[in-house]
Amino acid sequence: MVARVWSLMRFLIKGSVAGGAVYLVYDQELLGPSDKSQAALQKAGEVVPPAVYQFSQYVCQQTGLQIPQLPAPPKIYFPVRDSWNAGIMTVMSALSVAPSKAREYSKEGWEYVKARTK
Amino acid sequence: MSESELGRKWDRCLADAVVKIGTGFGLGIVFSLTFFKRRMWPLAFGSGMGLGMAYSNCQHDFQAPYLLHGKYVKEQEQ
């Protein structure tokens, strides 16, 4: 009797945890349209770092530990979009002139071989 | 489509993919721990579902200027 009640309780607890997770996802519209997901990610990016910082400060106050200040990471500016676009344009222009260039080089090569065999 | 609009669409797609894959993974963890005895397949299933949903959203987003959507309009009775 006790074992059955305990297994039922366990099932209810697991069901409520899983149901709560599903409801949270539904309420925050995380699996909905892309603009809602983007807004949720932006909100998380604004909320999480101050929360983590406050928690670390609280832990430091309670335990007396001092977390050392890390130096700021170096800012690297590499315009991926520009270099990617330039790369794509170079590749596409090379592909577009490839047949005519191949014809020209093969013609030159043929002329060269003809001249050598005369 | 202008390049800035294309860039915005790509940003939205990537953010959407991150959120959906993460959500699917998280739900997979919850269900794996609660009902499926810590097996790996709910995690893979959830992540895959999130990836598929993100891909579908991205596809609709990029094809949006070219797709024509019909709408049913109810006749208004006077």
Curated annotation (Swiss-Prot), chain B:
- Which top-level group of life is the source organism from? Eukaryota
Which UniProt keywords are given for this protein, alphabetically ordered?
Acetylation, Membrane, Mitochondrion, Mitochondrion inner membrane, Transmembrane, Transmembrane helix
| Modified residue annotations for N-acetylserine | S2
Q: Where are the transmembrane segments?
A: 17-36
Q: Plastid as a keyword?
A: no
Which Pfam families does the entry mention? DUF543
- The protein's name is MICOS complex subunit MIC10
